[in-house]
Amino acid sequence: MKRLLKGFSHTDAYEWFENEGVRLTTQEDECVFPVSQDAMEIVNTLTQIINRLGIRLLTGHRVELISHDKENGKYSLRFGGNRSSATADCVVVAIGGTPAASQLNMFSPLDIITENPVPSLFSMCLPGDGIKKLMGTVVEEATTSIPGTKFKADGPLLITHWGMSGPAILKLSSHAARFLHEHEYKTDICINWCGGRKAEEVTEELSAISASNTKKQLASAYPPHLNARLWQHLIERSQVNPQLRWGELQRKGLNKLVNTLTADIRRVDGKCRFKEEFVTCGGVSLKNVNHSTLESKDHDGLYFAGEVLDVDAVTGGFNLQAAWTMGHTVAVAIEKKYKN
């Protein structure tokens, strides 16, 4: 993607949409959304442009099979139902992510290599975990990881009535999509409630709180990035008496608090859909395509763009940017190929 982004970057996309009348805003985590917070504004804008350019849009035409006659170079598209088939000199496949491998069967006559699609953007279920009572609580800077792996993510973490969500969880689900699928969404996750800070740093912070609040109970004085309810929960999880005064806290109790704050192990058992799981990893393998033009290596005039390819990213416009960049790449390649 880095090479392709040089041809049509996030800046280009930003300017393009604003020139078409869509006002955008960039959040602190660099995610871009319409100021209206209405995704349909993007859809409506694209639809208006299609109509303005006189592009024919066939709805209700589900493609069942794509075949290629290499002798005359023509492609044949077979539609579902009683609809007649269509022929084309060039085909661009931009069907988005597919939650089921069977939806990639349209490529079967072409011997296209595909990777099994699996969800890659979802929140996590923590059945039986008492933290769910704190639903609605947000920790702005948290780090999540899966013990024994290199999968790691950071960002805001949201406690929900089913478990956990927010960027720190959604990013982790994206990075570890195949791992989680293979383990049937049952795994331990490790949470650092202090934004990735090391145990030594958190020990210093709690020691400073202790020194300034010797007569206060543990539940009454706590790190400023946590709220009182979550702090109470974490104290109890550390098996430390919340009514203990800071001046009475021994080293052993301090270490327990630090360990919970920096390495809180929770059990995940299941996933919850995030906006109907509109992101998947898997799809058409990148081994099939020329990485500069996104044209098939084996079928002249066949292109792929967007999430139908085995690419995915986190929420906030990154998947859309990848799709628009690839769309631009394919358009330029087709113009160059067929301009004569």
Predicted feature locations:
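Core beta-strand elements of the Rossmann-like FAD/NAD(P) dinucleotide-binding domain
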Residues: 58, 80-90, 152-155
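A conserved FAD-binding loop/helix module that cradles the flavin
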Residues: 90, 94-108, 310-339
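Conserved N-terminal/central alpha/beta ligand/cofactor-binding core
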Residues: 1-56
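Residue-level recognition of phosphate/Mg2+-coordinating polar/acidic sites
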Residues: 6, 12-30, 78, 94, ...
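A conserved short coil-to-beta-strand element within the FAD-binding core of flavoproteins
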Residues: 59-75
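Short loop/edge segments at beta-strand edges and connector loops
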Residues: 57-61, 116-118, 306
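Short hydrophobic core segments
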Residues: 63, 86-98, 106-108, 157-162, ...
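Glycine-rich loop(s) and the adjacent beta-strand/alpha-helix scaffold that form part
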Residues: 90-132
